[in-house]
Amino acid sequence: MGIADEADRTLFVGNLDPQVTEEVIFELFLQAGPLIKVKIPKDNEGKSKLFAFVNFKHEVSVPYALNLLNGIRLHGRQLNIKFKTGSSHINQEGKSPANSQNPSPANTPGHRGGRTPEQMGSPSYSPPQHMQRPFSSPDTLQRQAMMNNMWQVQMQQLQMLSGTFQQGMQQLRGNADGGWSGHRGQRHSPQDNNNHQGRDQRHGNGANNYERNRRDGQRGDFYHHDDRSGGHNRNYPPDRRRDSREGRWKHF
């Protein structure tokens, strides 16, 4: 693998913020394709310079990363991405901006073609701890929670309505069965009442006959006792005593 091949797989990234690290650049450019390494050069005092070199595993990732990420903002600074000096992509028409052979940040012109990040279609990039990843906003999470709560309430209401409907159907079915059973049980009630009334009437007539005979017998005994007593207590005329005796003999 020669130097030219490595240059074809490398991008120059300028106008970096001093807070940007090699790890941040690595994770940022990883979305364009697999990487081999990221290098931020240092000056004689050991301070990081404001540009970096990104080395991709595949050459096809280089122009794709340039079109995808050139002009985005990182820590408030707009990145200036170019092909590295010596890259064959520079000589290809429409692949490299003017004066791209000089990688020095001091001579770096604006981003390619003067296109803004909005024209490139790439969002701004600000990482948490140096990198930011996509996440759901609080409003989105709140709406999702409200939708979930509404769905749960609707399901509970449907379950309650279903249980009430089933209970009502069971009660209606039980009332219908009970009414039919009671109707069947009362079908012979008029005849039974007539039978009871007939029996009560017969018993009542027998009791009346018995009571009448008993009173007649007591009345005859009374007259008989009065006649034997000699009439000391009461004086009855002879005709009445005779009638009493005749009634007594007739009774017996």
Curated annotation (Swiss-Prot):
InterPro entries: NEXT_complex_subunit, Nucleotide-bd_a/b_plait_sf, RBD_domain_sf, RBM7_RRM, RRM_dom. Disruption phenotype: Morpholino knockdown of rbm7 causes several degrees of the severity in the phenotype. Mildly affected fish are unable to swim away normally upon touch stimulation. The body shape is slightly shorter and sporadically brain edema could be observed. The moderately affected fish have a curved body shape, smaller head and eyes. Heart and brain edema are frequently observed. In fish with severe phenotype the body shape is completely altered, the tail is absent, and the head and eyes are smaller. Residues 9-86 form the RRM domain. One of its GO terms (biological process) is cerebellar Purkinje cell layer structural organization. GO terms for cellular component: nucleoplasm; nucleus. Residues 211-230, 237-252 have a biased composition (Basic and acidic residues). This is RNA-binding protein 7. The lineage of its organism: Eukaryota, Metazoa, Chordata, Craniata, Vertebrata. PANTHER family: RNA BINDING MOTIF RBM PROTEIN -RELATED, RNA-BINDING PROTEIN 7-RELATED. GO terms for molecular function: RNA binding; single-stranded RNA binding. Its main location: nucleus. Component of the nuclear exosome targeting (NEXT) complex composed of MTREX, ZCCHC8, and RBM7 that directs a subset of non-coding short-lived RNAs for exosomal degradation. Keywords: Nucleus, RNA-binding. It is found in: Nucleus, Nucleoplasm; Nucleus. It comes from Danio rerio. Residues 88-137, 171-252 are annotated as: Disordered. RNA-binding subunit of the trimeric nuclear exosome targeting (NEXT) complex, a complex that functions as an RNA exosome cofactor that directs a subset of non-coding short-lived RNAs for exosomal degradation. NEXT is involved in surveillance and turnover of aberrant transcripts and non-coding RNAs. Binds preferentially polyuridine sequences and associates with newly synthesized RNAs, including pre-mRNAs and short-lived exosome substrates such as promoter upstream transcripts (PROMPTs), enhancer RNAs (eRNAs), and 3'-extended products from small nuclear RNAs (snRNAs). The gene is rbm7. Residues 88-107, 119-137 have a biased composition (Polar residues). The RRM domain mediates RNA binding; the RNA must have four nucleotides for efficient binding. Mediates the interaction of NEXT complex with promoter upstream transcripts (PROMPTs) and potentially aberrant forms of other non coding RNAs, such as snRNAs. The RRM domain exhibits specificity for polyuridine sequences.
